[in-house]
Amino acid sequence: MAFNLKNRHLLSLVNHTEREIKYLLALARDLKRAKYSGTEQQTLKGKNIALIFEKTSTRTRCAFEVAAYDQGAQVTYIDPNSSQIGHKESMKDTARVLGRMYDAIQYRGFKQATVNELAKYAGVPVFNGLTDEFHPTQMLADVLTMLENCEKPLNQISYVYMGDARNNMGNSLLLIGAKLGMDVRICAPQALLPEDSLVTLCQQFAQQSNARITITDDIDLAIQGVDFIHTDVWVSMGEPLETWGERINMLMPYQVTPALMQRTGNPNVKFMHCLPAFHNSETTMGKQIAEQYPQLANGIEVIEEVFESSANIAFEQAENRMHTIKAVMVASLA
């Protein structure tokens, strides 16, 4: 079946086929090699891209900006403090304004409905840099990183997500594994597993791709022989301190420790994290949590010993955000 990614949105990967996702991964690999070898060709000269950030970011902003500059495009960074978005102007109107000035729009914020609305009214490609529900650019980077760190073909790679699986990382890792025919395992307390509607959708994708999906609260079942362990933060800034205790107590068995890595039975298992990670109490929020919960002074979702070990490939993930985002922009705009 022929496909065309020209002028395509990237909103969640729900509407991307297995072949389209694999094409983006192959393009990202090629662009990465070209950058490393100094042979990269600029294909986005004259393009202008708006970067809307309702949520702050380090990796997403830097990845989009560097990827755009590498390809000859110009970007404009827009945040709530420097625009009328959400204050005096609706997202619908913002989309119709920016769509007349820019060739594409990136959005990083809260509701998936917001990025969908942008895509509906902008008239230009819209790329989801993160919403509460999905994180598609991170998924492309994660799969590229797994391919680079495993000699198995894609359909034989196994990975598990540990922790609060109701968030964008749990949702997105379930989705992309189902799309690509991988062995994907979601491991969380029953109260923190993905929504049934998403699970049903991903099971349908898995039937088409021959993916293996395991959703469980049984840690030993989920991690057995796995190639990669993913996790994400358990708490977010702005959440009331009193709500942390119940969730932390629920998630403590799912903390990524050396013992948990060993329980996989795979001496080559790798650790992955979308970052930022609370692996010690050196940050402001890490200190705040450690004061309230002293048992977490050496890390929350992952402890320092794992994070600083050779098993950690999270910084390769972070770099691959740039290469995969570049692939998305080139495929859509070049």
UniProtKB/Swiss-Prot annotation:
UniProt entry keywords in alphabetical sequence: Amino-acid biosynthesis, Arginine biosynthesis, Cytoplasm, Transferase
Pathway it works in: Amino-acid biosynthesis; L-arginine biosynthesis; L-arginine from L-ornithine and carbamoyl phosphate: step 1/3
Chain positions recorded as carbamoyl phosphate binding sites: 57-60, 84, 108, 135-138, 274-275, 321
Enzyme class: transferase
Pfam families for this protein: OTCace, OTCace_N
Compartments (UniProt record): Cytoplasm
Principal subcellular localization: cytoplasm
Residues binding L-ornithine: 168, 232, 236-237
EC assignment: 2.1.3.3
Catalytic activity: carbamoyl phosphate + L-ornithine = L-citrulline + phosphate + H(+)
Keyword Cell cycle attached: no
Any GO MF annotation of the entry: ornithine carbamoyltransferase activity
Transmembrane recorded as keyword: no
GO cellular component, one term: cytoplasm
BP GO annotations: arginine biosynthetic process via ornithine; citrulline biosynthetic process; L-arginine biosynthetic process
Family: Belongs to the aspartate/ornithine carbamoyltransferase superfamily. OTCase family.
PANTHER family linked: ORNITHINE CARBAMOYLTRANSFERASE (PTHR45753:SF2), ORNITHINE CARBAMOYLTRANSFERASE, MITOCHONDRIAL (PTHR45753)
Function: Reversibly catalyzes the transfer of the carbamoyl group from carbamoyl phosphate (CP) to the N(epsilon) atom of ornithine (ORN) to produce L-citrulline.
Name under which the protein is recorded: Ornithine carbamoyltransferase
